[in-house]
Curated annotation (Swiss-Prot):
Subunit relationships: Homodimer.
EC number from the UniProt entry: 6.1.1.23
Native species: Aromatoleum aromaticum (strain DSM 19018 / LMG 30748 / EbN1)
Lineage of producing organism: Bacteria, Pseudomonadati, Pseudomonadota, Betaproteobacteria, Rhodocyclales
Described purpose of this protein according to its UniProt entry: Aspartyl-tRNA synthetase with relaxed tRNA specificity since it is able to aspartylate not only its cognate tRNA(Asp) but also tRNA(Asn). Reaction proceeds in two steps: L-aspartate is first activated by ATP to form Asp-AMP and then transferred to the acceptor end of tRNA(Asp/Asn).
Name of the protein this chain belongs to: Aspartate--tRNA(Asp/Asn) ligase
Keywords: Aminoacyl-tRNA synthetase, ATP-binding, Cytoplasm, Ligase, Nucleotide-binding, Protein biosynthesis
Subcellular location, principal: cytoplasm
Encoding gene, per UniProt annotation: aspS
Family the entry assigns: Belongs to the class-II aminoacyl-tRNA synthetase family. Type 1 subfamily.
InterPro entries on file: Aa-tRNA-synt_II, aa-tRNA-synth_II, aa-tRNA-synth_II/BPL/LPL, Asp-tRNA-ligase_1, Asp-tRNA-ligase_1_N, Asp/Asn-tRNA-synth_IIb, AspRS_core, GAD-like_sf
Positions with a binding annotation for L-aspartate: E172, R218, H451, R492
Amino acid sequence: MRTHYCGQVTAADLDQTVTLCGWVHRRRDHGGVIFIDLRDREGLVQVVCDPDRAETFHTAESIRNEFVIELTGKVRRRPAGTENPNLVSGEIEVLCHTLEVLNASATPPFQLDDDNLSENVRLTHRVIDLRRPQMQKNLMLRYKVAMAFRRFLDAQGFIDVETPMLTKSTPEGARDYLVPSRVHPGQFFALPQSPQLFKQLLMVAGFDRYYQITKCFRDEDLRADRQPEFTQVDIETSFLDEAEITAIMEDMIRYVFREALAVELPNPFPRMTHAEAMRRYGSDKPDLRVTLELTDVTDAVQDVAFKVFSGPATSGGRVAALRVPGGASLTRGEIDEYTKFVGIYGARGLAYIKVNDVTKPNDEGLQSPIVKNLHEEALRTILERTGAESGDLIFFGADKTKVVNDALGALRTKLGHEKGYVSGAAWTPVWVVDFPMFEYDDESKRWVACHHPFTAPKDEHVELLESAPGECLAKAYDLALNGWEIGGGSVRIHRADMQSKVFRALNIGDEEAQLKFGFLLDALKYGAPPHGGLAFGLDRVVTLMTGAESIRDVIAFPKTQRAQCLLTDAPGEVDDKQLRELHIRLRQKIETQVEVAKA
């Protein structure tokens, strides 16, 4: 039907006759001539309908926004002064010869150039929303990124293998999405949170290098960077150690950015341990564009009169300082807003000191309600360690280590971007390595895996699995970019005895382990190779590349933060016949029936 895409007609096509199909983006009458901006996925082109062609002009008078049309016309140069440098086709226009309406359109629920729409409106009318040029650019970039991943992995000898979508529910990690079995009453499949165990089994089977771009499912509370179903670039390889795996993955990310954005990322990526990241940035995914850093002052305030500091400092907590250069100019109102902000992360307050004269480490040179409760030696140490200068402000966090890290880490990022404490680098990737193997869960009173229970401990820490699990480090690594974790992985356990030892450290006994993970333990007995891998969040990578506010802007049909699809009204009710076939009764309906019977 067409000879060209609208957005690809250029001055190279001058004097040619072209046939175009697309949507009417905008129609306007001007001096007896009708102008149509015709749109398809490649962009816009201006079409001119002259009254000299009466039939064509009459048809043009009847069309409205979002009508689908086909036209044939001649490409000509726009009159001088009317060019549009923002369009690929901005130097030319098409003089329309014939025009046919392929389909009319009802009045759209909103204009495509309306930037003030609520997300609910956009998601309810997602088909119309996806016609917006920015949304089409986002999804086209997503396609380019996915293809770049594939090209790189194909060239490196990785093979694409599909793994099951209906699998076994395991208790580790987030909640599973369960699928009832009709043919096995009372039993359930689970949708995979990741292909983790299957890709390990593929390594045991000898496939050496695997990848898959696949959907994963997690029934967890949603945030701006989370969805109940998300897309993962999943990778596993055999006979490579941690350094070799991360080197290949680093090359891959550089290749993807080069292909998709024509951007050169640093070579090599910086690396830091998890302990260093938490100490300096309060985060295991630090945004290195922000130049602010945390400074630990726990030891300096153990004997001060200010119990808010000395309490955590003497009971295993943390006291950290965040120096804000020139921050003494912050108003009381701004400080109050930052105090509210850290409260989101569990902080019970936000102490601060304004440094009016750094040469006077007392209430003469320092302005704060807390100065009188800190002795001069502590104040001098704080000023020296933070590198404070006159005119600066120092914020403090004092609490359990996790609360301090979460609160000051988030405040660091917020202050950095709001007040301009950022470097000139547009992209700051960083490997974070040597994660703790376990973390203690106060609610269940047991150790849980920081990554997952199939991660190998560092060789020199194997003996700590039983004696001091909290000190055991893992062969785990995450790749962070601009404050987002875009990928994470580890070297896996490839020996059955070691896997059983880790299960026991997690309070998973041999019988329970065999029941839940027997297929893995059995496979590891048959000559499993050393192996490891990594998974990248495709949605997150594309979100960063586009600068979108949410990953929902780079997914064609996303769920809301309440895990709903407003377009299809899912999840929804199903009829009783389907439930009976699945051997399911709804508790709410049963309770309602009982109440009716009692009445």
